């Protein structure tokens, strides 16, 4: 009886419409300069990402490149990245911190981290203090001034140990690496990208999505140390609800076995987000 009444009410009010069709996903294209007024997102395997903003600023996130099995050979030499204006690091694990010290030396770009990693980078002599820019988790910075991209550090459900070999002793050491974070990057044209770094599923993804309204999420799907395909689908479909999603952090080790196909299947055919699956080294313009 209650079901029949609800069906009648839906018919009268039009309140039970079918889900909106998925957003049309941009097609990956060959690397090059982004079109005027657009942003270019270039995924390079695992979490390594280069974003070229509509204003021409180049932001590199989690640059694990030279030993990354998924990075195209052409990008395993750091000069291939070209101009770099800013380096963002989500946390201290080697597959994210990666080549940050070498890239900072090569480009003289500032290194930003919103989770406390910067102090360790300086104290261990990995990055000069003059190049390290610290800001708090949930804080917002505008590195290029008020008309440039705006970057906010948000929560990630993960860990952040910094492991390295001490050159003085030759011994492996583990140091505190701050807290893991993700980044909401609002570009000059208002387009918002959430690079989630490494994270498990957490309920406040809904709140972050409601506050910042990201157009695009770069979301880990590999499983083992991050969300797998099922959890990532819940995050995108039920909590964040972005326009587009690019799966990252998968198939770089036997443990991170999730696939884009599993992610898309878990998301379902009626999900509102368009899923984009570029190959490492393919750019997507927005």
Curated annotation (Swiss-Prot):
A Pfam entry, by short name: Lactamase_B_2
Keywords noted in UniProt: Hydrolase
One function term, GO molecular function aspect: hydrolase activity
Entry-linked InterPro entries: Metallo-B-lactamas, RibonucZ/Hydroxyglut_hydro, UPF0173, UPF0173_UPF0282_UlaG_hydrolase
UniProt similarity note: Belongs to the UPF0173 family.
HAMAP family to which the protein is assigned, alphabetical: UPF0173 (MF_00457)
Protein name as catalogued: UPF0173 metal-dependent hydrolase RALTA_A1748
Taxonomic lineage from the root: Bacteria, Pseudomonadati, Pseudomonadota, Betaproteobacteria, Burkholderiales
């Amino acid at each position: 009886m209650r079901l029949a009444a609800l069906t009648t009410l839906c018919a009268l009010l039009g309140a039970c419409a079918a889900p909106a069709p998925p957003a049309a996903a941009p097609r990956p294209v060959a690397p090059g300069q982004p079109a005027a007024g657009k942003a270019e997102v270039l995924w390079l395997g695992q979490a390594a990402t280069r974003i070229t903003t509509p204003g021409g600023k180049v932001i590199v996130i989690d640059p694990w490149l030279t030993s990354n099995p998924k990075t195209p050979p052409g990008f395993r030499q750091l000069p291939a990245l070209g101009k770099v204006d800013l380096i963002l690091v989500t946390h201290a694990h080697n597959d994210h911190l990666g080549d940050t010290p070498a890239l900072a030396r090569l480009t003289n770009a500032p290194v930003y981290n919103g989770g406390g990693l910067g102090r360790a980078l300086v104290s261990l002599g990995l990055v000069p203090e003059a190049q390290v820019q610290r800001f708090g988790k949930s804080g917002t910075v505008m590195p290029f001034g008020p008309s440039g991209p705006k970057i906010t550090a948000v929560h990630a459900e993960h860990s952040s140990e910094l492991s390295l070999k001490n050159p003085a002793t030759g011994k492996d050491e583990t140091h505190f690496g701050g807290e893991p974070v993700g980044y909401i990057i609002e570009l000059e044209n208002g387009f918002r990208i959430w690079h989630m770094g490494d994270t498990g599923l957490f309920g406040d993804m809904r709140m972050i999505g409601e506050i910042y309204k990201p157009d695009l999420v770069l979301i880990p799907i590999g499983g083992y140390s991050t969300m797998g395909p099922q959890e990532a689908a819940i995050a995108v479909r039920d909590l964040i609800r972005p326009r587009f999603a690019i799966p990252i952090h998968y198939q770089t080790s036997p443990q991170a076995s999730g696939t884009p196909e599993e992610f898309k299947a878990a998301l379902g055919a009626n999900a509102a987000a368009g899923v984009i699956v570029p190959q490492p080294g393919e750019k997507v313009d927005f």
